[in-house]
Curated annotation (Swiss-Prot):
Superkingdom as given in the UniProt entry: Eukaryota
Principal subcellular localization: secreted
Secreted keyword on record: yes
A GO CC term attached to the entry: extracellular space
The protein, known as: Protein Turandot B
Lineage start: Eukaryota, Metazoa, Ecdysozoa, Arthropoda, Hexapoda
Function: A humoral factor that may play a role in stress tolerance.
Gene name as annotated: TotB
Pfam family, one: Turandot
Annotated signal sequence range: 1-21
Localization of this protein: Secreted
Keywords carried by this UniProt record: Immunity, Innate immunity, Secreted, Signal
One BP annotation, GO: response to bacterium
Family, similarity comment: Belongs to the Turandot family.
Length: 139
């Protein structure tokens, strides 16, 4: 009986891992989305509003990154999101949430710099996964 239980648990673990894997198709879709976000985010408010979408894409891709890549980006995100103030008060609801309220000019500058650097980091990772020749053939 123990063998059957262990086998069932192992099968469920294996199936769960395979179903939740970050597929090549999802990577390509996210790669195109990051490129679109970076290309179409021209003003500060748009950049600030799209930070959460970049963080969502990063959270999807993070488990498939090398440990050093993940640690580098996690440190960058933590360094910039923990200190973001909204109306002079630290943001609530988690370290990785950016509220869509009016920010002071200094905070807006920090947030847009964060957007630019995070977007560039994600784009760089996608470029390393999909060299230009592969990406160009898929378009």
């Amino acid at each position: 009986m123990n063998f059957k239980t262990a086998l069932i648990c192992f099968a469920l673990l294996l199936i769960g891992t395979l179903c939740s894997a970050y597929s090549n198709q999802e990577r390509q879709r996210d790669s195109r989305r990051v490129a679109e976000i970076m290309r179409t985010s021209l003003d500060d408010n748009t950049k600030i509003h799209r930070i959460q979408e970049l963080l969502t894409i990063y959270n999807r891709m993070a488990p498939s990154l090398r440990p050093d890549e993940r640690a580098r980006i996690d440190r960058f995100i933590s360094r910039h999101t923990e200190g973001i103030m909204v109306d002079g008060v630290p943001s609530q609801g988690g370290a990785r949430k950016i509220f869509k309220k009016t920010l002071s000019p200094a905070a807006k500058s920090v947030a847009t710099g964060f957007f630019t650097e995070l977007g560039a980091s994600l784009a760089s990772l996608f470029t390393s996964w999909f060299p230009a020749t592969t990406t160009e053939r898929n378009h």
